Design a protein with these regions (language model features):
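Loop-centered beta-sheet repeat module
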Residues: 196-204, 223-224, 236, 245
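Structural signal for the C-terminal ends of transmembrane alpha-helices
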Residues: 85-91, 122-123, 175-182, 245-255, ...
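Membrane-cytosol interface segments of multi-pass membrane proteins
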Residues: 1-218, 320, 325-326, 346-390
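Conserved protein kinase catalytic core
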Residues: 59, 255, 339
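Hydrophobic alpha-helical segments of polytopic membrane proteins
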Residues: 179-196, 253-273
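Membrane-interface micro-motifs in multi-pass membrane enzymes
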Residues: 70, 158-166, 230-245, 290-294
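Alpha-helical transmembrane segments of multi-pass integral membrane proteins
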Residues: 233-234, 241, 265-376
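Membrane-interface segments at the starts/ends of alpha-helical transmembrane spans
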Residues: 219-229, 351
Length: 390
């Protein structure tokens, strides 16, 4: 899965990944007002993905949500398209070089850190892969190309396949945003639904044909080359990303009052709660993974992209501050927690009774440290070095 994203991959004032977060100060000249509630949402999404990978005990009432939290990877891609378009779509000129360097500066330093921390995992990869697969993964993964090979998408850092998709989406964004888009809200809404439906066609065909010849309905533990292609290949997420861009344009075209946004936020959240409480376990996994809930997520984004009590709750400063670390949390949590458990760190420290919560806290602390001591300084250094010399 991933989030990223991916703005600050996971910065609403810049972009979103799965998995960066928005700033909350006054907008710079030429920039739109920040949307801190969307950063708060990222906090909730990222924590659910952590729980999906490492499910906490004694939270059975939340298991229907936690066990389906893979759906939030699509939410991150939706946010990525929305926030990028929100910030860049109406600029008269989009300097592609500056845009791509800015995206690289956000993603790659922490990505390299995640690979360095995960170096021990290469030993495990060596034992379960053929030599050809191992050395191919060793080339594809540092170059963010692993997502194009369904059998190696999770090589080295299981969750980092999402960055392969982000690279493709970022490469395409300057061209997508300059397409002649509809102007009216009704046509934009129709386009949004159409693009979403097109994105679900491959997943629907998979359900009808079952090309992997699975013995039963697919679930999170199922595997097969076609299913892995749908789950990990960058192409599978283009439509969700384009829905995000369309949603940003719809957001601009609509005239929505604060009360209407509140209704959208409460209504979409109520439907989502009802869905996870009642029918999520009876809904085909392949469709959920492919973005079945994207329209509901889109309504929620519209509801939170303005002033109302629900948006204010998600914009609470502690939640926003955590939201600014979600890219690092997403990228680092999987192998960090696995390594902590591999070496029985809580038990050796006499803190086994506090596990898994102390392990979650350690992963979060690492994400905070990486955000402030690696991601931001490295990004500033890259942008400074890439700036034209006067």
């Amino acid at each position: 899965m991933h989030p990223n994203h991916t703005g600050s991959s996971l910065n609403v004032s810049e972009e979103a990944v799965p998995l960066n977060a928005t700033t909350t100060g006054a907008p710079a000249p030429g920039r739109r007002p920040p949307l801190p509630a969307l950063t708060g949402v990222r906090t909730i999404l990222a924590l659910n993905i952590v729980f999906f990978h490492f499910t906490p005990p004694h939270m059975h009432y939340l298991y229907p949500l936690i066990n389906a939290s893979y759906v939030f990877v699509g939410f991150f891609f939706l946010l990525s398209g929305f926030v990028l378009a929100y910030n860049y779509a109406d600029r008269p000129v989009l300097d592609k070089r500056k845009f791509w360097i800015a995206r690289f500066a956000r993603l790659y330093p922490v990505y390299l850190l995640s690979l360095a921390i995960s170096f021990k995992m290469l030993q495990a990869e060596w034992h379960v892969r053929s030599h050809a697969q191992f050395f191919t993964g060793l080339v594809l993964t540092p170059t963010l190309m692993q997502g194009w090979n369904q059998s190696l998408a999770t090589f080295w850092n299981t969750v980092a396949w999402t960055l392969s998709a982000e690279v493709v989406l970022y490469a395409a964004f300057p061209y997508l945003v300059r397409i002649r888009w509809p102007k009216s809200a009704s046509r934009l809404a129709a386009l949004l639904i159409a693009v979403w439906a097109v994105g679900l066609i491959p997943h629907t065909l998979y359900l009808l044909i079952n090309p992997d010849h699975l013995p039963g309905p697919a679930n999170r533990y199922s595997s097969g080359p076609w299913l892995r292609t749908l789950k990990y290949t960058p192409i599978a997420y283009i439509c969700i990303f384009v829905v995000g861009i369309t949603l940003a344009k719809l957001h601009t075209a609509l005239s929505i009052s604060a009360r209407q946004r509140l209704a959208l936020a409460i209504g979409s959240m109520a439907v989502l709660v009802l869905f996870f409480a009642t029918v999520v376990t009876r809904t085909p996994y392949v469709l959920l993974h492919g973005g079945l809930l994207v329209p509901l997520f889109s309504v929620l984004v519209l509801g939170l992209s303005g002033q109302n009590v629900v948006a204010s709750a998600f914009a609470w400063r502690p939640i926003v501050l955590l939201g600014q670390t979600t890219f690092c949390l997403y990228l680092l949590h999987f192998n960090t927690i696995n390594l902590i458990r591999m070496y029985h760190v809580p038990q050796r420290l006499g803190l086994g009774a506090l596990d898994p919560w102390i392990t979650y806290a350690a992963a979060l602390a690492l994400a905070v440290a990486a955000t402030f001591w690696v991601e931001r300084p490295a990004r500033a250094w890259i942008l400074r070095k890439s700036a034209p010399q006067s």
